[in-house]
């Protein structure tokens, strides 16, 4: 009996790892496509949320549990830090992941309604990488220029991101 439980647990962990890896692949592919184009850069969180939604919902079906949701929410923010981005992304990713876990758990990981609401909050995990555009504006653009992006890119992003755009993101 104990061996059967371990096998089921191992399958769940493998499935969770697979879906987290698929989510990261979607994140990286969309990031590579969007990063050089200012308007796509600003749409990146929404594009990742849209294209990763089937992966998220399948993950909840095949590997229900808090750890897969939380790790999938936090790992991209750690990836951003590791690649030289401003390190405040986890300040948004951790609460977004925790809220997503609580909402999915409320529906016992089986309710489409609660899983969809959970995905909505989960998708905020990437917003931490964009928050500096508004709260650390000068530092963000200086850091972005030093990171190799063009002045034209920075000027376009600056023009497209007045304060009133923050709640729309």
Which residue stretches match the model-derived regions?
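Interfacial aromatic-anchored transmembrane helix boundaries in multi-pass membrane proteins
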Residues: 32-36, 40, 76-104
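Short hydrophobic alpha-helical membrane-anchoring segments
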Residues: 24-32, 57-61, 81, 85, ...
């Amino acid at each position: 009996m104990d061996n059967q439980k371990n096998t089921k647990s191992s399958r769940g962990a493998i499935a969770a790892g697979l879906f987290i890896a698929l989510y990261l692949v979607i994140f990286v592919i969309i990031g590579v496509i969007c990063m050089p184009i200012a308007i796509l850069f600003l749409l990146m969180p929404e594009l990742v949320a849209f294209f990763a939604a089937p992966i998220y919902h399948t993950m909840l079906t095949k590997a229900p549990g808090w750890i897969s949701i939380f790790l999938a929410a936090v790992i991209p923010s750690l990836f951003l830090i590791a690649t030289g981005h401003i390190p405040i992304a986890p300040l948004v990713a951790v609460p977004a992941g925790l809220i997503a876990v609580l909402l999915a758990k409320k529906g016992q990981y089986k309710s489409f309604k609660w899983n969809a609401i959970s995905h909505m909050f989960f998708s905020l995990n990437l917003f931490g990488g964009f928050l500096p555009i508004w709260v650390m504006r000068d530092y963000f653009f200086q850091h972005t220029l030093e990171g190799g992006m063009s002045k034209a890119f920075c000027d376009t992003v600056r023009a497209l991101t007045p304060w009133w755009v923050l709640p729309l993101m």
